[in-house]
Amino acid sequence: MQASRRTKRDSIPNLYAKCQLSGNCLPDVKNKVEADTLADRLLRWLGSVIYLGGLGIGTGRGSGGSSGYNPLGAPSRVTPSGTVIRPTVPVEGLGPSEIIPVDVVNPGSSSVVPLEDLTVPEVTIDSGEVGGGGLHPSEIDVVTSSDPISDVTGTSSHPTIISGEDNAIAVLDVSPTEPPTKRIALGTRGATSTPHISVISGTTEFGQSSDLNVFVNATFSGDSIGYTEEIPLEELNTIQQFEIETPPKTSTPRETIGRALERARDLYNRRVQQIATRNPAMLGQPSRAIVFGFENPAFDADITQVFERDLEQVAAAPDADFADIVRIGRPRFSQTDTGQIRISRLGRRGTIKTRSGLQIGQAVHFYYDLSTIDTADAIELSTLGQHSGEQSIVDAMIESSFVDPFETPDPTYTEEQQLLDPLTEDFSNSHLVLTSSRRGSSFSIPTIPPGLGLRIYVDDVGSDLFVSYPETRVIPAGGLPTEPFTPLEPPFFSEFYSSDFVYRPSLYRKKRKRSDIF
């Protein structure tokens, strides 16, 4: 049986050229072409520490590159390398633009320059007769000649510095300024018609003054000659601004960042159980919440406490949150995000105990947040005691009012007037309504003979029973009766609307007495 022969794959450059388009190159092909093999990485890493240049160490094919290797012993020649630097733009030479002839200086002459008084010559122009017409200034031709040596003035401005590309040549560009202008003043003295022309140079030395008047016109702008220095001005009496620093909330200095990070890493991590307790023993003596027993009042609670109990005397803790606590740390004070003070204690439970006596338990973080103290309302209080400059007058009659109608009667009314009813009763346009109960009631309204005013008096009938015996008078047509009528006696009453009746004793049937003898 003949074994299958292994087919050789294509070259690495051909494989990389084909698989690069699809992006599924083999790792060895890609690393070989891109020089990312393990050897290439080691060379890069070691090359950053030690120098390996000139050794020819690499992962190439060993052909010496595109130019090949030079044979041993062959003369070496220097190959041209680098870039050719082109010359820059030619710059003008340093010096004045025009050649000015200068007087020859005698070495034996004195170096002190004598001072001379400069006087302006007066030019007199004959204007003819006195009565003739005046001479207009525009008709006068004034010609001044300039001296090329004495008219050269310096400038106070800084020259322009031009530097080349290689920063090796510095050229100063000095531009001479134009000579100052001449000013001509024309005036007339007195009543004469002879004008006076004064030619004054534009440059005036310091300390000299001219006899000319100066007119300031805001429509014309001046020319600034020379270098001007701009000095920033500061405002006077400006409003000062300051920041109010927040006062500290505690008297102790602020803890460092390292201690804060250590505390956060110690109390607030995933291996520490967080328990919020409201037991007041957490603030003073936490042992009251862990074990039952006598507490020493002189005991300092600001230390770490360790609790050891025998298995025979195991009892439940007074607080269920502090069960199986074998160690509790000292109190730590911090501040919450809401501004409250938090008291924290780090404890450890003894849940599991091995035969060797090792206790294993979870770390517990007990914290107690103190309640906030609300700000007191601002109540304006009165000052106690007497002070100079202050006086208070108290009058009980003004502050209080006493009501007693008997002691302080009204002087406008007498006793009789107070008993009278000041209200006037008016019964005009009124109706008389008579009401009665279930039983029949008789009302007697007396009649008054005609001719007299009709006056009807209605008694105020309440819940009581009133019995009335009316009298009837028959007035004959002739006048009043002479003898009064006498009512019948005794009167006889009959009730027609009675709800019951009563038999008289004489109407009852008499029963005969029967004897049992027969």
Curated annotation (Swiss-Prot):
Principal subcellular localization: virion
Protein name: Minor capsid protein L2
Species the sequence originates in: Human papillomavirus 65
Oligomeric and partner information: Interacts with major capsid protein L1. Interacts with E2; this interaction inhibits E2 transcriptional activity but not the DNA replication function E2. Interacts with host GADD45GIP1. Interacts with host HSPA8; this interaction is required for L2 nuclear translocation. Interacts with host importins KPNB2 and KPNB3. Forms a complex with importin alpha2-beta1 heterodimers via interaction with the importin alpha2 adapter. Interacts with host DYNLT1; this interaction is essential for virus intracellular transport during entry.
Domain of life: Viruses
Gene name of the encoded protein: L2
GO MF term set: DNA binding; structural molecule activity
Top-level taxonomy: Viruses, Monodnaviria, Shotokuvirae, Cossaviricota, Papovaviricetes
Motif interval(s): Nuclear localization signal: 1-10, 509-515
InterPro entries: Late_L2
Covalent S-S links between cysteines: C19-C25
Subcellular localization: Virion; Host nucleus; Host early endosome; Host Golgi apparatus
